Amino acid sequence: MRIDCLPALQDNYIFLLVDVEQRQAAVVDPAEAEPVLAALQAEGLTLTAILNTHHHGDHVGGNRRLLRQFPEAAVSASAVDRDRIPGQTVLLEAGDRLQICGQTAEVLFVPGHTRGHIAYYFPEVAEGNPRGALFCGDTLFAGGCGRLFEGTPAQMLDSLQQLRSLPDDTAIYCAHEYTLNNLRFALTVEPDNFDLQQRYQAVAIARQQGQATIPSRLDIEKATNPFLRWDQAALQAAVSSQDPVQTLARLRSRKDQF
């Protein structure tokens, strides 16, 4: 399975999953249809599946147009979002598995950003890609996490704990190019984190050159993303709490005002 990253809207990424041998593809969080249709046409691919992580318009905005072109494509999303996903045909629960482009995707229930948010975890992808791939929408970002629009800090902590427990070499495919600003914030709460300092410098150069910072990798996030470091003493001191939920809540509140 090949994974292509398609820029969309202002700062979104759409992910096209390609089975080269079968000439088929699936798409994760199509913010808009046009980049997807162009990529499919360029290679003569048939779209067989749409995977939505949550209901926000910049993640489902392309569903209807894609279904007009490929009406047989299955649309998968959380059962919680059954009335909020255009064209949904597959209602997913935690622990469900899907066969996508010859690979198995495991469904993780990760509420917090929204009440129905899910992530798709592929334990194995094709040769040339990392050992696993996580498509996490707006739950986990490179250097950050999503705002709590519908969920609680406790829910988000539980969701991030699930993601943090995946193998360290898991590739993190989040849906927005927020990395540089996220790392700027991270430096305000962990200014002495050497790994974070180094990452910020590398990301700043990459963005100056117009390069994407996605995918990230889980071990990098665990070393530099404050929202996966709620149990680190330096970070707890920065927010004056040793309680994991309160630590995450205070971090999120600070980031909202950053």
From Swiss-Prot:
GO terms for molecular function: hydroxyacylglutathione hydrolase activity; metal ion binding. Keywords: Hydrolase, Metal-binding, Zinc. Zn(2+) 2 binds at residues 58-59, 138, 176. It comes from the Bacteria. CDD domains: hydroxyacylglutathione_hydrolase_MBL-fold (cd07723). The keyword Iron does not apply. Binds 2 Zn(2+) ions per subunit. The keyword Cell division does not apply. It is an enzyme of class 3 (hydrolase). Zn(2+) 1 binds at residues 54, 56, 113, 138. Pfam families: HAGH_C (PF16123), Lactamase_B (PF00753). InterPro entries: Clx_II_MBL (IPR035680), Glyoxalase_II_hydrolase (IPR050110), HAGH_C (IPR032282), Hydroxyacylglutathione_Hdrlase (IPR017782), Metallo-B-lactamas (IPR001279), RibonucZ/Hydroxyglut_hydro (IPR036866). Belongs to the metallo-beta-lactamase superfamily. Glyoxalase II family. Thiolesterase that catalyzes the hydrolysis of S-D-lactoyl-glutathione to form glutathione and D-lactic acid. Monomer. This is Hydroxyacylglutathione hydrolase.
